[in-house]
C-alpha cells in the first residue's frame, strides 16, 4: 500500500512515503525535504545463537549521482565510506540502539541512501527520521519513534533545519533526536553559548519534532505491520536468586576498590567463583546452555550494586562524591622535536597530544555532495588496545575513534585563529595511553595545551568533561567526570566542552526514556563547574600561549602582490616558482588574490625566497636608486635592467656631467652601475640617470660644465662616427618593458587549489 504524508517544518515541506520503493525490506521510507531525498530501509533477520551483543549496523551512504557528479579514481564508483558518512551513520545508531528491546540479538541493518541532494539541505537528520519511520512501520520490535531535528541560531533566533549556507553563519548548531516525551540524543557545537541558551535550543528542537512524530504515527496507523513477538531469554527465578546470594556481598566489596585493575581482577575472580559454584550445584551439562544468561545476570547484579551505592550512599566507585573531579596532571613540551606537545592525565585516563603546523598544501580536501571544501584544522584521535590492557589487531581508525576525534575537533575549532592572523594548517593527534573514562575529553584538554605549547594564538583555552547520570526509582545522581564503569553502568553519557565563557561542543547519549529540563540544567551546571576547575589546572601548567613557534616549525611569511603579477612568480609552466623552491628549499603557495605564503623552518631560506619574489614583482619607484646591469647599447644611450625583466633607458645625456661623445666610452654591455629613476610614463617606459648620482664638479668649471650639459641637451646628440648624418628616427627608442609584463610570462594564474610548489 502506497502512502505519502507531509508536514511543514522549518518553512519547507517534509515528506515521508512508503510502498513504492524497496518493498522487500521489512520497512522502507523515502524522506524528501526540498530536493534532497533519502531512502531508508530496515531489515532484521533471525537470531544467531551464541551472540552476547546486539548486532545492529547503521549505514549512511552518499551516492555521487545524487549531486550530479561522477566519482573520481580509476574505477569511477563509490568506494569505502568517507568520514562524513561514518559520522552520519553514528548519528543514526546512537538514538536508535537504546530503543530496541533488552536482549534483542537479531542481525539488524539500517541503510540510508542519499538519492538526491539539492546541496542546501543536509541529509543526516533526514536519514535519522527516515530510519525511525522505517523501523516504526516494520514488524521489527522497537520502542520508537524518534525524530532528528537540526537546530541553528541565526541572528539571535532559533531556526529549524537551517540550510548549509545558514549553518556557516549560526552560532549554535545542534542535531537533536527527540521522542514524544523527551530528548534522547544531542550532537553539536556552539560559539561559547551559555548553558541556558543550550537548553533553550534543545527545547526548541523538541517542540519542532512533535508534528513529525505525529506524521510517523499516522503512517504507522495506515501501513504499519504487526510487531514480531519477542520475549527476552531469562534465567529461572531460582537461579537468579542464587546468583544474587553468591555474588552480591563480594560485589559490594569489589566495587569499593578504587584501582581499576584491582577492581577488574576482583570482578574476574567473582565470575570464576560463580561459575564453579553453579557448576557444582547444577551440574556442568545443565549450566552449559545457561552460561550466556548467567554472565548477563552477573552484569545485572554488578550494575545494581554500583547504582545503589551511588544513589543510596552518595559515593562512587573510586570514593568521590557526585561533583568531584579526579586528580589532574598536565605537562607540556615533553617531545623535543614536535611543534607542540602535552600530556594530560585525569585519574586513570591519560593522553599524549601533539600539534603539528603545516602550510596550505597540507590542508585536507573534502569532496562530498555539497561540493569541494578544504580543512585547515583537523584532529585525529587514536585508541590503541594497550590503553585498556588488551590485545587487538592494529587496523585503521574505527567509527568510535572517528566520532571521538570529530567531537574534540568541534570543541577546539571555533578557537582557532583566522588564516589572515595565523596562516598555518594545524593537525592535532591524540594518543590515548590509558583509559578509564572520558578519553575524548582528555583529547580536548591535551589538544588545547598542545596548541598553546605550539604557539598557536587560540582565542580562549578549552576544556572538556564527561557527565553521567544514575536513576534508581525516584532517586537520581548527576555525576561529574565519569569513569568507564559509570559510563557503562549508568544512564547517560553527556560530554560538554567549552571555554570559561561558554559551550563550544556537546554530545549526549542516554539509555532511559528521556531527561527532564531540571536534570539537563543540573548536568550543564555541574559541567560548567567542572570545566572551570579543569581549566584552572591546565592554566597552572601553561598560563598563556607561547610567544614563539618551535624552532622546528615552518615559518610562514605572507606578502601580497598584485593579481596580475602572479604570472611573474609562477613563470611559464611553473618554471620560475619551481626554480625558487629548488634554490631555497621553501614551500610557496600563491592565492588568486595575490597573497603569497612562503614557509620553511629555515628563516634564512624564507628571506632568500622573499627577496627573489620581491625582485620579480617590484615596480620601479621614481627617485629610487637601483644597481642595474647594462643589457644593450645604442647610439643614444644604454638599456639597463634595474629589476628582473624590467629595463630602463639611460640616455647618453644622463651618463655624466660632461658631454659624452660615445656611449661605449662610459658603459659597456654587462657593466653593473647605480642609476636613479627619473620618471615612468603612462606606457611604463622608464627614464634613468647616472649623472644625478655623480658628484658635481667644483668651482667655476663645474658651473660651466652644467651650462654646457644644458646646452648639449638642447642641441641633441653628437653626429654618428660610423657614417654621415645624425641618428635620426626615434630618439627615445624602446625605453624598457612595462613593469609587471613580460613576453615569456603569459597566461592567467592557475586556480587556487592547484598547488604551486
Curated annotation (Swiss-Prot):
Keywords: Cytoplasm, Magnesium, Metal-binding, Nucleotidyltransferase, RNA-binding, Transferase. GO terms for molecular function: 3'-5'-RNA exonuclease activity; magnesium ion binding; polyribonucleotide nucleotidyltransferase activity; RNA binding. PROSITE patterns: KH_TYPE_1 (PS50084), S1 (PS50126). GO terms for biological process: mRNA catabolic process; RNA processing. GO terms for cellular component: cytosol. It is found in: Cytoplasm. Residues 623-691 form the S1 motif domain. Its cofactor is Mg(2+). The keyword 4Fe-4S does not apply. The keyword Repeat does not apply. Its main location: cytoplasm. InterPro entries: ExoRNase_PH_dom1, ExoRNase_PH_dom2, ExoRNase_PH_dom2_sf, KH_dom, KH_dom_type_1, KH_dom_type_1_sf, NA-bd_OB-fold, PNPase. It holds the Pfam family RNase_PH_C. It catalyses: RNA(n+1) + phosphate = RNA(n) + a ribonucleoside 5'-diphosphate. Residues 702-711, 719-757 have a biased composition (Basic and acidic residues). Residues 554-613 form the KH domain. Involved in mRNA degradation. Catalyzes the phosphorolysis of single-stranded polyribonucleotides processively in the 3'- to 5'-direction. NCBIfam families: polynuc_phos (TIGR03591), PRK11824.1 (NF008805). This is Polyribonucleotide nucleotidyltransferase. It comes from Sorangium cellulosum (strain So ce56). The lineage of its organism: Bacteria, Pseudomonadati, Myxococcota, Polyangia, Polyangiales. The gene is pnp.
Amino acid at each position: 500500500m502506497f502512502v505519502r504524508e507531509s508536514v511543514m517544518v522549518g518553512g519547507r515541506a517534509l515528506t515521508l512515503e512508503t510502498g513504492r520503493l524497496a518493498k522487500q525490506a521489512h520497512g522502507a521510507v523515502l524522506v524528501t525535504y526540498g530536493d534532497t531525498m533519502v531512502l531508508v530501509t530496515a531489515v532484521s533477520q533471525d537470531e544467531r545463537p551464541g551472540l552476547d551483543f546486539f548486532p545492529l549496523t547503521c549505514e549512511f551512504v552518499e551516492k555521487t549521482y545524487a549531486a550530479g557528479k561522477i566519482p573520481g579514481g580509476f574505477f569511477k564508483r563509490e568506494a569505502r565510506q568517507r568520514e562524513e558518512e561514518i559520522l552520519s551513520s553514528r548519528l543514526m545508531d546512537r538514538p536508535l540502539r537504546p530503543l530496541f528491546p533488552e536482549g534483542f540479538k537479531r542481525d539488524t541493518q539500517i541503510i540510508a541512501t542519499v538519492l538526491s541532494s539539492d546541496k542546501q539541505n543536509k541529509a543526516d537528520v533526514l536519514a535519522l527520521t527516515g530510519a525511525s519511520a522505517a523501523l516504526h512501520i516494520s514488524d521489527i520490535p522497537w520502542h520508537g519513534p524518534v525524530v532528528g531535528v537540526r537546530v541553528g541560531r541565526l541572528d539571535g533566533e532559533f531556526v529549524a533545519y537551517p540550510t548549509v549556507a545558514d549553518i556557516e553563519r549560526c552560532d549554535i548548531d545542534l542535531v537533536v533526536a527527540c521522542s514524544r516525551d523527551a530528548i534522547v540524543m544531542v550532537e553539536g557545537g556552539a560559539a561559547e553559548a551559555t548553558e541556558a541558551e543550550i537548553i533553550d535550543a534543545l527545547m526548541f528542537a523538541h517542540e519542532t519534532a512533535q508534528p513529525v512524530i505525529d506524521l510517523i504515527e499516522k503512517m504507522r496507523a495506515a501501513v504499519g505491520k504487526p510487531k514480531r513477538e519477542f520475549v527476552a531469554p531469562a534465567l529461572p527465578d531460582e537461579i537468579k536468586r542464587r546468583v544474587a546470594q553468591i555474588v552480591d556481598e563480594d560485589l559490594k566489596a569489589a566495587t569499593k576498590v578504587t584501582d581499576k585493575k584491582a577492581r577488574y581482577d576482583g570482578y574476574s575472580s567473582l565470575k570464576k567463583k560463580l561459575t564453579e559454584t553453579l557448576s557444582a550445584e547444577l551440574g556442568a551439562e545443565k549450566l552449559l546452555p545457561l552460561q550466556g544468561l548467567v554472565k548477563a545476570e552477573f552484569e545485572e547484579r554488578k550494575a545494581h550494586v554500583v547504582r545503589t551505592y551511588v544513589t543510596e550512599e552518595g559515593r562512587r566507585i573510586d570514593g568521590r562524591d557526585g561533583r568531584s573531579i579526579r586528580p589532574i596532571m598536565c605537562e607540556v613540551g615533553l617531545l623535543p622535536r614536535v611543534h607542540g606537545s602535552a600530556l594530560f592525565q585525569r585519574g586513570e585516563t591519560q593522553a599524549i597530544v601533539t600539534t603539528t603546523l603545516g602550510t596550505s598544501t597540507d590542508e585536507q580536501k573534502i569532496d562530498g555532495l555539497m561540493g569541494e571544501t578544504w580543512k585547515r584544522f583537523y584532529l585525529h584521535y587514536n585508541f590503541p588496545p594497550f590503553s585498556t590492557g588488551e590485545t587487538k589487531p592494529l587496523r585503521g581508525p574505527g567509527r568510535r575513534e572517528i566520532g571521538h576525534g570529530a567531537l574534540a575537533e568541534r570543541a577546539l575549532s571555533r578557537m582557532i585563529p583566522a588564516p589572515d592572523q595565523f596562516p598555518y594548517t594545524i593537525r592535532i593527534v591524540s594518543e590515548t595511553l590509558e583509559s578509564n573514562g572520558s578519553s575524548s575529553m582528555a583529547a580536548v584538554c591535551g589538544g588545547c595545551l598542545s596548541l598553546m605549547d605550539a604557539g598557536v594564538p587560540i582565542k580562549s583555552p578549552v576544556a572538556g568533561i564527561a557527565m553521567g547520570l544514575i536513576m534508581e526509582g525516584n532517586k537520581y545522581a548527576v555525576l561529574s567526570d565519569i569513569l568507564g564503569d559509570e559510563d557503562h553502568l549508568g544512564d547517560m553519557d553527556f560530554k560538554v566542552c567549552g571555554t570559561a565563557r561558554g559551550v563550544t561542543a556537546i554530545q549526549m547519549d542516554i539509555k532511559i526514556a528521556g531527561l527532564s529540563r531540571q536534570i539537563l540544567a543540573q548536568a550543564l551546571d555541574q559541567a560548567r563547574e567542572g570545566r572551570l576547575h579543569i581549566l584552572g589546572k591546565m592554566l597552572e601548567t601553561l598560563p598563556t600561549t607561547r610567544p614563539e613557534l618551535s624552532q622546528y616549525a615552518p615559518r610562514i611569511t605572507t606578502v601580497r602582490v598584485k593579481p596580475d603579477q602572479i604570472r611573474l612568480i609562477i613563470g611559464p609552466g611553473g618554471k620560475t616558482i619551481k626554480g625558487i623552491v629548488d634554490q631555497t628549499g621553501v614551500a610557496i603557495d600563491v592565492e588568486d588574490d595575490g597573497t603569497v605564503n612562503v614557509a620553511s623552518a629555515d628563516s634564512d631560506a624564507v628571506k632568500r625566497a622573499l627577496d627573489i619574489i620581491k625582485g620579480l614583482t617590484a615596480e620601479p619607484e621614481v627617485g629610487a636608486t637601483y644597481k642595474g646591469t647594462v643589457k644593450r647599447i645604442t647610439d643614444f644611450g644604454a638599456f639597463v635592467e634595474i629589476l628582473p625583466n624590467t629595463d630602463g633607458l639611460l640616455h647618453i645625456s644622463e651618463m655624466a656631467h660632461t658631454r659624452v661623445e660615445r656611449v661605449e666610452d662610459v658603459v659597456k654591455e654587462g657593466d653593473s652601475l647605480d642609476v636613479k629613476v627619473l620618471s615612468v610614463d603612462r606606457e611604463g617606459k622608464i627614464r634613468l640617470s647616472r649623472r644625478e648620482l655623480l658628484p658635481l664638479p667644483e668651482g667655476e668649471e663645474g658651473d660651466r660644465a652644467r651650462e654646457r650639459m644644458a646646452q648639449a641637451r638642447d642641441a641633441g646628440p653628437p653626429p654618428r662616427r660610423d657614417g654621415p648624418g645624425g641618428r635620426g628616427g626615434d630618439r627615445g627608442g624602446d625605453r624598457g618593458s612595462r613593469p609587471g609584463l613580460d613576453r615569456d610570462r603569459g597566461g592567467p594564474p592557475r586556480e587556487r587549489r592547484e598547488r604551486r610548489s
